[in-house]
Regions:
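Hydrophobic faces of well-ordered beta-strands that scaffold small-molecule active sites
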Residues: 5-11, 35-37, 69-73, 101-105, ...
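Short, acidic/polar
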Residues: 15-27, 177-185, 312-322
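Conserved, mostly hydrophobic/aromatic
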Residues: 31, 61, 92, 137, ...
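N-terminal beta1-alpha1-beta2 module of alpha/beta enzyme domains
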Residues: 1-71, 171
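Acidic (Asp/Glu)-rich catalytic clusters
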Residues: 25-29, 58-67, 89-101, 187-188, ...
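Glycine-rich, proline-tolerant flexible connector loops at the mouths of alpha/beta enzymes
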Residues: 36-61, 76, 109, 114, ...
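Alpha-helix-loop-beta-strand connector modules within alpha/beta enzyme cores
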Residues: 48-71, 129, 133-136, 140, ...
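An alpha-helical appendage that flanks or caps ligand/catalytic pockets
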Residues: 123-164, 204-209, 213-325
Length: 356
């Protein structure tokens, strides 16, 4: 059984609640399949934003929408114990209803750096943390008893009684991953894989190989696994105006990769055909003049290498098809730029019908 091809929108939890809810509602009206919320961390203050709890925001979104699926894309078990993650997932099930919630877990390299996790000398890496988190969360959400003594986490909970008012529906769990170890873990232990920003079609092909290898090792059917790719994007009837938002978001992410997660990001940049020396001026511009100045440092050639879903509706359709053909089954479009609600509407009118 293969998974359906879906197109959704991803935003970061770094803007006021009302604004994020309005965007989710606009995406629902436009016909997008999923609204993902990635948890922003205090690093985004450098760009004039404030970090907020994505789990709190998504519960509000779920209660104020009707059809669109809501996804955590991602939250980190370095910030929440798996038992707490399961408790917050219960709230999402209550607010959204069965079948409207996807649970994404990831290490978040930038946050690990901020809180000192994953440093040299630590006993266990992200793969152990993710595996144990999935073990605990999945059993609790299924209503089972937990008596868990892992390398990282300890957890104890009795089984859910029949009379308890709680959903028994299965919640799909995803792992956000850039490297091969976690990508294979997504194949063996999760329902799907979510890739990081600056994903390109070549990176999708790379991730698909690792995801399917993990699935085969676990005796699972590779075609049943979902592969989501976070791709910066923007749209306008005018091609150049349609690329402005994607250019600015690409600038913020590329600067982040230079400043915070060099090393782990190499494979992303390699698959995009980018060198650190090529994008270092973007980070310099960010430090000196902020995100608008950094956007000016993103050349047309760099934006082309990033393979953003940006420009006119026809250009966006062409790029989405490229990702689909590379093996991406879940487009996570990170819309940025002026009037994102209108951009979502234009995607709904002129792009989404081509993929239905």
């Amino acid at each position: 059984m293969s998974v359906p091809f879906r197109i959704g929108v991803l935003q970061l939890s770094m803007e006021p609640l009302e604004q994020t809810v309005r965007m989710a509602q606009a995406c629902e009206r436009a016909g997008f399949d999923i609204f993902w919320l990635a948890e922003a961390y205090p690093w985004w203050r450098k760009h004039g934003f404030e970090a907020r709890s994505s789990t709190a925001i998504t519960a509000v979104i779920a209660a104020q929408t009707q059809r669109i699926v809501i996804g955590w894309g991602i939250i980190s078990p370095y910030t929440r114990h798996p038992v707490q993650i399961a408790m917050e997932a219960r709230v999402m099930q209550d607010a959204a209803g069965d079948g409207r919630f996807l649970l994404g877990l990831g290490a978040s390299k930038i946050f690990m750096k901020e809180i000192g996790e994953g440093e040299q000398g630590r006993d266990f890496g992200p793969a152990v943390v993710m595996r144990e988190s999935i073990d605990i969360v999945s059993v609790i959400l299924a209503g089972g008893a937990v008596d868990y003594h892992g390398k990282v986490f300890q957890a104890s909970a009795p089984a859910l009684k029949d009379e308890a008012h709680a959903s028994r529906a299965r919640v799909p769990i995803y792992i956000g991953a850039t490297g091969p170890v976690l990508q294979r873990l997504a194949g063996s232990h999760a329902d799907g894989l979510l890739t990081a920003s600056i994903t390109t079609p070549d990176f999708i092909r790379y991730a698909r190989v690792n995801l399917e290898e993990g699935a085969r090792r676990a005796g699972k059917e590779p075609a049943a696994l979902d592969l989501g790719g976070v791709i910066v994007g923007s749209i306008h009837r005018d091609s150049q105006k349609g690329k402005e938002g994607a250019r600015e978001m690409a600038a913020m992410y590329l600067a982040n990769k230079v400043q915070n997660i060099r090393g782990s990001a190499d494979v992303l940049l390699d698959k995009a055909g980018l060198q650190f020396a090529e994008i270092a001026p973007i980070a310099d511009a960010m430090e000196k003049g902020g995100r608008k100045a950094a956007a000016q440092a993103v050349s047309d050639d760099i934006l082309k290498k990033v393979r953003a879903i940006a420009g006119t509706p026809d250009e966006c359709c062409e790029r989405i098809a490229e990702y689909r053909d590379a093996g991406c089954t879940n487009i996570m479009l990170e819309i940025w730029g002026d009037d994102r609600e209108e951009q979502a509407k234009l995607f709904g009118e002129a792009v989404l019908p081509h993929f239905r």
